[in-house]
Amino acid sequence: MKILNSLKTAKSRHPDCQIVRRKGKLYVICKTNPRFKARQR
């Protein structure tokens, strides 16, 4: 999982990527290709 300052590029890396908010942090999750997972600082 990458830790990024901005998730704008992370969500457009794959069509299945979606942004989720958990416990006050923003995550990008991708079911089909889990290597695109990311979290915002």
Curated annotation (Swiss-Prot):
Protein origin, superkingdom: Bacteria
An example Gene Ontology CC term for this record: ribonucleoprotein complex
GO molecular function, one term: structural constituent of ribosome
PROSITE patterns in the record: RIBOSOMAL_L36
Keywords per UniProt: Ribonucleoprotein, Ribosomal protein
Keyword Ribosomal protein carried by entry: yes
Disulfide bond annotation, renumbered to this chain: none
GO BP field: translation
Pfam families documented for this protein: Ribosomal_L36
Family: Belongs to the bacterial ribosomal protein bL36 family.
Protein name listed in UniProt: Large ribosomal subunit protein bL36B
Classification of source organism: Bacteria, Pseudomonadati, Pseudomonadota, Gammaproteobacteria, Pasteurellales
